[in-house]
Amino acid sequence: CLEIAFDENLNVLIGDNEAGKSTILSAIDIVLSGSRNKVEMYGLQSLFNKEIIDEFLNSSKEITNLPKLEVELYLNDQNNMNLEGNYNSLQESGHGLLLTCEYREDLTKEINEILNQEEANFPFEYYSIDFKTFSGESYTGYRKYISHLFLDNTQINSEYATRKYIKTMYQAN
């Protein structure tokens, strides 16, 4: 579990390469966007902690011990009742958004077949991707609660990416 308290005015993330700075920003972007496509673009295998996956694969591989990914964004009061509630890990009233990725219980039989194989396969494709507000209401990329802009200069490497970047800039204003 990683918890980061941000200042409301300015925050600077400093660290060595591969320390997780971009991962933190990407997680925030994914939750704010409510986009399943973004999750699939990154791939669940890159969002989960590699050590947690390896630890599971080296264990007895019980389906009930499959890791679960949760990203919670606690927000200041947004004057939006849809964001307010206690549907969060602390079960405390607040404003926020939540991404949950967990194995689908309706696919237990198929998942067990994969886990019982000799080779170390993790069943990422049998995970659900769920976006909810702290009120427990589902949301998607079509119903964004907060406008945001995520600039990643490593992705601006083509004419298409540049046009998309400029379009996003104008939409944020």
Language model features with spans:
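Short structured motifs
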Residues: 54-59, 82-86
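Pre-Walker A-like glycine/lysine-rich segment at the N-terminus of P-loop NTPase domains
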Residues: 1-33, 42-53
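Short beta-strand or tight-loop elements
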Residues: 49-52, 67-71, 95
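Beta-strand-rich, non-transmembrane domain signature
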Residues: 37-39
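Intrinsically disordered, low-complexity, mixed-charge
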Residues: 58-66
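Structured loop/turn residues at beta-strand edges in well-structured enzyme cores
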Residues: 8, 67, 124
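Short mixed-charge
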Residues: 47-56, 109-114
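Electropositive, glycine-dotted interaction segments
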Residues: 70, 76-173
